[in-house]
């Protein structure tokens, strides 16, 4: 399960936290979400992403970036902007975006060499 956790560098770096509640109309959502992760991964400064979604539509995605410039570049990417507009008009009942600077981290992995 450790592969779920992004392999981030030593801080400092930045986290963009996207919390959302999906609407019932999610036609095309899965494909677009996968495309956005793939596209983000190709952007300068992208460090990783972790995402979960509950059956009731609640979800959270945390993406990690090396700078605010990288975040702003991604934020203004044309295809990302189109996906955000579709999210507001069709896919989400509500969402929140928060940006935080990561100043320290602690990682743990159970020893599985027994």
Swiss-Prot record:
Signal peptide extent: none
Top-level taxonomic group: Bacteria
Disulfide bridge map: none
Residues annotated as domain ABM: 13-99
PROSITE patterns: ABM (PS51725)
UniProt-listed PANTHER family: ABM DOMAIN-CONTAINING PROTEIN, BLL5343 PROTEIN
Name the UniProt record assigns to this protein: Uncharacterized protein YqjZ
Organism: Bacillus subtilis (strain 168)
Gene: yqjZ
């Amino acid at each position: 399960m450790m592969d779920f956790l992004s392999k981030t560098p030593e801080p400092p770096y930045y986290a963009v936290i996207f919390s959302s509640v999906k609407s019932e109309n999610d036609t095309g959502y899965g494909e677009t979400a996968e495309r956005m992760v793939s596209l983000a991964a190709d952007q300068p400064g992208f460090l990783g992403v972790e995402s979960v979604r509950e059956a009731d539509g609640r979800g959270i995605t945390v993406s990690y970036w090396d700078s605010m410039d990288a975040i702003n570049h991604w934020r203004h990417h044309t295809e990302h902007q189109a996906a955000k507009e579709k999210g507001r008009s069709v896919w989400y009942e509500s969402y929140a975006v928060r940006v935080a600077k990561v100043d320290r981290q602690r990682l743990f992995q159970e020893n599985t060499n027994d």
